[in-house]
From Swiss-Prot:
Gene Ontology cellular component annotations, sorted alphabetically: extracellular region
Name this polypeptide is given: Allatostatin-A1
Compartments where located: Secreted
Keywords: Amidation, Neuropeptide, Secreted
Similarity comment text for this entry: Belongs to the allatostatin family.
The protein's role, per its UniProt record: May act as a neurotransmitter or neuromodulator.
Superkingdom as given in the UniProt entry: Eukaryota
KW Secreted (keyword) present: yes
Tissue specificity statement from the Swiss-Prot or TrEMBL entry: In larvae, expressed in the CNS and midgut but not in the ring gland, thoracic perisymapthetic organs (tPSO) or abdominal perisymapthetic organs (aPSO) (at protein level). In adults, expressed in the corpora cardiaca, corpora allata, brain and the thoracic-abdominal ganglion (at protein level).
GO annotation terms (biological process): neuropeptide signaling pathway
Modified residues (Leucine amide): L8
Length: 8
């Protein structure tokens, strides 16, 4: 769960 939603 990251504050940015990228598939990284």
């Amino acid at each position: 769960a990251r504050p940015y939603s990228f598939g990284l």
